[in-house]
């Protein structure tokens, strides 16, 4: 019984470590839709929302309507 418990705990720890390695170092993106997108405003909104170092945001026009823009926040996962 002790072997099974020890093996189960080892496997759970191994799986958790593998999941953490997969997400470390990746860049995630989230979209914000302000009424009027400006790069400085977008960048500050992203920094406020995620409260991390290395977060940045920029405005991008969507494919369908080039007059409206949205903000892309990029941050470390």
UniProtKB/Swiss-Prot annotation:
**One record GO biological process:** killing of cells of another organism
Location in the cell: Secreted
The stretch of residues making up the signal peptide is: 1-25
Q: Which Pfam families is this protein grouped with?
A: SLR1-BP
Cystine pairs: 28-77, 37-59, 42-71, 46-73
Cellular component GO terms held in the UniProt record: extracellular region
**What keywords sit in the KW lines?**
Antimicrobial, Disulfide bond, Fungicide, Plant defense, Secreted, Signal
Where mainly found?
Answer: secreted
Q: Where are the transmembrane segments?
A: none
PANTHER family (alphabetical): DEFENSIN-LIKE PROTEIN 122-RELATED, DEFENSIN-LIKE PROTEIN 184-RELATED
User: Which family does the entry's similarity section mention?
Assistant: Belongs to the DEFL family.
Protein name in the entry: Putative defensin-like protein 129
Species this protein is from: Arabidopsis thaliana
Species lineage, top-down?
Eukaryota, Viridiplantae, Streptophyta, Embryophyta, Tracheophyta
Quote the gene name from the UniProt entry. Answer: LCR13
